Swiss-Prot record:
The chain crosses the membrane at residues 8-28, 49-69, 75-95, 106-126, 138-158, 178-198. Keywords: Cell membrane, Electron transport, Membrane, Translocase, Transmembrane, Transmembrane helix, Transport. This is Ion-translocating oxidoreductase complex subunit A. One of its GO terms (biological process) is electron transport chain. The lineage of its organism: Archaea, Methanobacteriati, Methanobacteriota, Stenosarchaea group, Methanomicrobia.
Length: 199
């Protein structure tokens, strides 16, 4: 039991910090740059991604292990996972549109783009490639979503704060500036690589 808890904690740390999808693996950068102009939009998008990643990890585990593997259809996993993610995103979009219309409008095109967010698909595929069981898959899905949230909120806070100061013209305020900030954030996260040995 203790070994299992240690394993889950290690997977959690990997998902949030060591294998952070945005700052270490550079997956899902479209929303990272596009939605982090203010904290409200970034937190809404992050919540949606955490939900989709956690649910996709759970549903995809069941789909892969109880349907695709017994029927020897493992080669369809990517397509099957994309369909699962798309269905979950439609559910999230429906809920957000109905209950938080202001957030729905502020997220714009980025909410449906969670379907094509490679970070979500990457998390699900890593669960299969690492041969995680259900608990490990769910923990990794939640941790990857929380890692995404940490990076999104840090970026949004920095960008909001930088609106109050003068930025050199050579750096600018658009995408160039966002990637400049992301580079510095990424370098700080690289230091986490020494915490847990990667296989």
């Amino acid at each position: 039991m203790v070994k299992m808890a240690e394993s889950l904690f290690t997977i959690f740390l990997e998902g949030v910090f060591i294998k952070n999808f945005l700052l270490i693996q550079f997956l899902g950068l479209c929303s990272f740059v596009g939605v982090t102009k203010d904290l409200k939009s970034a937190s809404g998008m992050s919540g949606a991604v955490v939900f989709v990643m956690a649910m996709a990890a759970t549903v995809s585990f069941a789909l892969y292990n109880f349907i695709l593997v017994p029927l020897k259809l493992e080669f369809l996993r990517t397509i099957a996972f994309i369909v699962v993610i798309a269905a979950l995103v439609q559910l999230v979009e429906f809920i957000v549109r109905k209950h938080v219309p202001a957030l729905y409008r502020s997220l714009g095109i980025y909410l449906p783009l969670i379907t094509t967010n490679c970070a979500v698909l990457g998390a699900v595929l890593l669960n299969v490639m690492n041969d995680y069981d259900l608990a490990q898959s769910v923990v990794f899905g939640v941790a990857a979503g929380l890692g995404y949230t940490v990076a999104m909120l840090m970026m949004a806070a920095i960008r909001e704060r930088s609106d109050l100061v003068e930025v050199p013209k050579s750096v600018g305020r658009g995408v160039t500036y966002a990637f400049f900030i992301a580079t510095i954030m990424s370098m700080s996260f690289v230091n986490f690589f020494g915490v847990i040995p990667l296989e």
